[in-house]
Regions:
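Long, positively charged amphipathic alpha-helical accessory segments at protein N-termini or as interdomain linkers
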Residues: 78-105, 116-195
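N-terminal lobe of the biotin/lipoate ligase/transferase fold
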Residues: 1-101
Length: 195
């Protein structure tokens, strides 16, 4: 993965970027980094997670045979900020809508899921702590790019409506959208969430 275009996006210009083939959980990896005294903001992308999870510690199913976009990043937000998981959902929805005109059946499910038609497309897990009057968030995102083999799960995938979108294209579009909306006020973000 080439992160050179993402490094130019203002919000992410001071982040370090890592691409790992396999890991337990990108959220856990970023959280561990935030505890170090020489902490530098980071975005970590994984091809496969063995211990990925969602809200309420629900297991995030990823397959080596199916392609998913799985990444986590750190962000400092003001204490009065709109919830980061909602901003993440709005940014991912905006990124997908910007890449494909076939997104009319894409919707956000409270509080942290993206759905396409009647299947879960992905989710956002945010873990936060307050440090020096700011919220330090670790935002983890998992999006199904292609279909997963477990048919017992009610899932959908990006390739159902936009087969041209790869995880590299979607990651860049998400980062651009996050950078665009992160400092919107709550009224503007609420409107985007409802739309």
């Amino acid at each position: 993965m080439n992160f050179s275009d993402i490094k130019k996006i203002p919000f992410f210009k001071n982040h370090i970027f890592e691409h790992v083939i396999e890991t337990g959980s990108t959220n856990d990896n970023i959280k561990a980094k935030t505890k170090k005294s020489d902490f530098i903001h980071c975005l970590q992308l994984a091809d496969f997670q063995t211990a990925g999870r969602g809200q309420y510690n629900r297991k995030w199913v990823s397959e080596k045979s199916g392609e998913s976009l799985m990444f986590s990043f750190s962000a400092e937000l003001p204490c009065d900020s709109f919830p980061a998981s909602l901003i993440g959902g709005i940014a991912m929805s905006g990124a997908l809508r910007g890449l494909s005109v076939n997104c009319k059946n894409l919707w956000l499910k409270w509080p942290n899921d993206l759905w396409y038609k009647n299947g879960k497309l992905g989710g956002i897990l945010t873990e936060s702590s307050i440090i020096d009057g700011k919220i330090l968030c670790v935002i983890g995102i998992g999006i199904n790019i292609s279909a997963i083999n477990d048919k017992s799960l009610n899932t959908s995938c990006v390739n159902e409506f936009a087969p041209e979108i790869t995880k590299e294209i979607l990651l860049k579009a998400f980062c651009e959208e996050w950078d665009k909306i992160i400092y919107y006020d709550s009224v503007a973000l609420s409107k985007l969430w409802r739309d």
